[in-house]
UniProtKB/Swiss-Prot annotation:
Bridged cysteine pairs (disulfide): none
Record-stated family: Belongs to the QueA family.
Top-level lineage group: Bacteria
Matches recorded under Gene3D superfamilies: QueA-like
Gene Ontology process terms (BP): queuosine biosynthetic process; tRNA wobble guanine modification
Name of the protein: S-adenosylmethionine:tRNA ribosyltransferase-isomerase
Amino acid sequence: MRVADFSFELPDSLIARHPLAERHGSRLLVLDGPTGALAHRQFPDLLDYLRPGDLMVFNNTRVIPARLFGQKASGGKLEVLVERVLDSHRVLAHVRASKAPKVGAVILIDGGGEAEMVARHDTLFELRFTEEVLPLLDRVGHMPLPPYIDRPDEGADRERYQTVYAQRAGAVAAPTAGLHFDEALLEKIADKGVERAFVTLHVGAGTFQPVRVDKIEDHHMHKEWLEVGQDVVDAIEACRARGGRVIAVGTTSVRSLESAARDGVLKAFSGDTDIFIYPGRPFHVVDCLVTNFHLPESTLLMLVSAFAGYPETMAAYAAAVEHGYRFFSYGDAMFITRNPAPRGPEDQA
């Protein structure tokens, strides 16, 4: 299976660089995986596709203002993008500078703050700050907008590049399917008899890294930390018992649940995952998916293709482009029912 199979033409004008005025104001492309049928709706119409007894699983990670600007004490500007918070004072981070800082180098943070480079781990730098990391980031950090948004972060991004139910700080990218939900819509979903549960997956900057191999089977995913609690396992078992569907809000929720069920049995799990879901891999937990539109040749598009079927997914994306849907993090959304017999690129006639 080749990465190029997942390419498609996307006009630059369809990349959403700012959020809409209202979270729920986006459009919703509904894809019935078993038939490939499409319906063009508005996001609040998601209610029409939910049933009493269903369970929606959300990712409650909270995006941290992970981008810092500063300079080495010896001179030279640099940019720091925190990848993972290790403890109250230490992080793993990407550092962009004309010359990489050496062990022992001191970094002076714009706005106040100081860190020392204490170790290097492949492409990541371990930094130790002189004050607690999370309060420092809240004070002087910038929201880590994806590279395709291609603009400086603004004050509004602190609210809008964050779900309304975000709780556990640690992500450097938003679980963007959740950005469409406001409190009023969540209340209507609950009123319909739909249950909810929360997993945590701290999305890393690697989610934006391109696939650099020709065959997708040769690709190795970056690691991200997740937690699926026993309460989630119990909620899913109860959902199954009453005949409900498990609806994942976002690919991060899918990856969390399927990581916790890698042997086919869902169990509570806390730790790193590098799960890579592409056509041919079975799903053990998720029945339906709410997700945004993803980048060409991305691992997330491959995940959607595994869920809905490759020809159905690529046809849906072609329809989305034709109808002017907005793409990527601040863009529109899809609601997908899983295809029980998905085909891959090699199965095309």
